């Protein structure tokens, strides 16, 4: 390992530990009462503009090896940092609003802390490898994604968050990412990271994905490169989707709600003046048993009929082959038995003709 790689690994590990420490601290401190949850749940955007309290972001908090003082000036030993991290400063954006979002989606602080903050629960990022300044870390249980974002994306999220907050409560089945928290951390003097905690779109490890499609509805430059294709679970793009003649089958029960939700989500993106977004589609090749269960669950009768037809045709083919084999045996037996009989008849008639001719000659 080179010195540079070693330094990057140490920095990445320090970042992971800092994030875990920060998330645990903030999530355990922010509590949403039943009254607050009912008060702000379902608020429209105009109503939320008068409730700036829930979108308030507090100043940076300093975490040291000896602990520190919280935002109320009280001594807090939980602010003592891990020895691998050292001193750092951090902040959480709109803690009350994000706490309401988490509760709205059925998350508790304890469940998130358990997934994110345990030892070895977060994969260290490959610093410097992210496109457009973005990096991803996944929790070991596949429930959450931590995305390190550039400053410009942080500004956009801060700007659109009130609209997002209102929209997800009106559309709980939305397909857009679920943002559970946004933070900033500065573990060293010359480094600063902004990150969001999101839901993992493909959390179930029982259904491993053979490949994924990142679809934008555009064809220009939308083809996976060789490096991406060689990955264990490659992510293909629009041109690959067309070239592979891929299809997405949605059952009749889900098709109309799905289309309506996509239209609503696209309308939200337009309202937010966002154009760089895509639909991520995961593909898992079903086994025969999984296919039967999926067809029943989604109400897809077409695939089931096709499957039955295949089985029926296979049975008919085997039955026809069996009948054909029987016919061949019968024909063969006819040939073996019938031909000598024919010869016998012919020889018998010849003998009769010879006797009759001899009798005529004697006369």
Where on the chain are the PLM-derived regions?
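Polybasic, positively charged surfaces/segments
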Residues: 1-363
């Amino acid at each position: 390992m080179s010195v540079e790689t070693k330094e990057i690994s140490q920095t990445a590990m320090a970042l992971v530990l800092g994030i875990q420490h920060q998330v645990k601290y903030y999530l355990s401190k922010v509590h949403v009462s039943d009254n607050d949850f009912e008060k702000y749940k379902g608020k429209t955007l105009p109503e939320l503009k008068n409730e700036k309290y829930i979108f308030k972001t507090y100043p940076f908090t300093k975490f040291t090896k000896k602990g520190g003082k919280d935002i109320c000036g009280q001594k807090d030993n939980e602010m003592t940092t891990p020895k691998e991290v050292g001193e750092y400063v951090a902040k959480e954006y709109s803690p009350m609003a994000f706490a309401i979002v988490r509760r709205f989606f059925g998350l508790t602080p304890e469940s998130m802390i358990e997934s994110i903050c345990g030892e070895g629960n977060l994969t260290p990022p490959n610093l410097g490898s992210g496109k457009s300044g973005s990096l991803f870390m996944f929790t070991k249980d596949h429930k959450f994604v931590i995305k390190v974002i550039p400053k410009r994306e942080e500004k956009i999220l801060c700007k659109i968050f009130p609209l997002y907050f209102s929209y997800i409560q009106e559309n709980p089945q939305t397909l857009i990412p679920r943002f559970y928290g946004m933070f900033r951390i500065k573990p060293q003097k010359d480094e600063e990271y902004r990150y969001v905690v999101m839901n993992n779109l493909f959390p179930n490890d029982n259904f491993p994905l053979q490949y994924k499609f990142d679809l934008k509805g555009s064809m220009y430059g939308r083809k996976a490169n060789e490096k991406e294709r060689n990955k264990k679970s490659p992510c293909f793009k629009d041109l690959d989707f067309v070239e592979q003649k891929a299809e997405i089958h949605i059952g009749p029960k889900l098709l109309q709600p799905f289309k309506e939700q996509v239209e609503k989500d696209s309308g939200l993106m337009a309202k937010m003046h966002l154009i760089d977004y895509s639909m991520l589609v995961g593909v898992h090749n079903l086994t025969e048993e999984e296919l039967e269960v999926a067809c029943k669950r989604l109400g897809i009768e077409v695939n089931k009929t096709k499957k039955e037809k295949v089985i029926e045709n296979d049975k008919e083919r085997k039955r026809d082959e069996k009948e054909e084999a029987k016919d061949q045996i019968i024909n063969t037996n006819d040939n073996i038995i019938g031909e000598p009989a024919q010869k016998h008849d012919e020889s018998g008639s010849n003998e009769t003709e010879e006797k009759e001719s001899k009798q005529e000659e004697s006369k």
